[in-house]
Amino acid sequence: MKRNGGTIGVFPLVVEMVVSGFLFLFILVLNLVMGALGYLMEKDDYDPDADLQKINKNPRKFQLGIMLALVEHGSVIALTIMLFIAFSPYNIILGIVWIIFRTGEGLIQYINEPNYWRLIEIARQYSLVSGAGKNSWSDLARSIFKTKDTRFKFAMICWSIGTLAFSIVLVTSDVVPQIIGWLGIVASVLVGFGTGIKLVKPRFKFEVVGALFGMLFEVIIGGWLLFYSII
């Protein structure tokens, strides 16, 4: 392979690509496990009373979900750095765009977690009171859920911009099959469009299509970088 007319060191490039591929797939697996533990990146319907009861029933499970979320956010930032090292020489400007926005994505989600962790204590307090006394704790939980959802939407806009920049590099550099890059472009546009509209119309469901395309893109690019790079 060549990078800006020069020969790329084979071993460093393979290492960068393999680690990037692993992180793509690792992040997807973490999201699945987090969902199974009750940690949701985004909620469409708010039922804080039911959520607080569920959290208080098994707080350790909820804690584990948050800890895995912290690992996921850190992995997003690590992936961004590895992709920048491996691919930015093909287009440094687009490389700077994706490292800014995808690092921003990870940092925005980190900001959520201290408040989300508070739900464990809120759930405990909620269980100790009855009647109207529950309302204040329920309202506080609802506020935390809404704040998290809003921040998540901004994180997804960062994902969209960063992934669009990365995908354009994939299409123009011929490092991977162009179809993968085009899939990333489609996914990033759909996610950005759907998320932007949902900020205005919360009941808008089109972002699900973008999410499916985004997952498909990350599975394919992750698998290609992890396995094809070492063949």
Report the location of each language-model feature.
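Hydrophobic, aromatic-enriched alpha-helical segments typical of multi-pass transmembrane helices
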Residues: 2-231
